[in-house]
Amino acid sequence: MIADPAAISEHTIDLHAENFKNTRYDGRRFSLSNDTVTALERIVCSIQFIYGARDALPHSELADRANLVERLHPHSEFVVVPDAGHWVQYEAAADVNRLLLAFMTASA
């Protein structure tokens, strides 16, 4: 989840435990199925994908995911944040916020 084990604190563990406890959605089932592609095919607006370069969870290579996005949504944005893991928005909050604001401003 977190790329740098030194960044894991009691707060991080508590946050993950609370999120896990409140989850009502099985993301593993969705990410391992063709439902992801089907859902992406139905989206008609631009999409921004933000991944951490050190995310150990994708079930395919980031390059494969980027190619899929390019094929399905050539005008969308696929960004890989260096030195971040699956919790890219937690580990690289300033970078993710900057990317989101730039994307939303350009899309407005």
Over which residues does each language-model region extend?
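Conserved alpha/beta-hydrolase catalytic His-Asp/Glu region
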Residues: M1-C45
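Residues at alpha-helix caps and immediate loop-helix transition turns in enzyme cores, especially N-
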Residues: R28, L32, S60-D64, A92
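Phosphate/oxyanion-binding loops and surfaces in catalytic or ligand/nucleic-acid-binding neighborhoods
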Residues: M1-P5, N19, I50, A56, ...
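Conserved loop-alpha-helix segment in the C-terminal half of the alpha/beta-hydrolase fold
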Residues: Q48-A84
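Generic structural signal for small/hydrophobic residues in well-ordered secondary structure
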Residues: H16, L40, F49-G52, F78, ...
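Catalytic active-site module of serine/aspartate enzymes centered on a nucleophile-bearing elbow/loop
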Residues: H73-A108
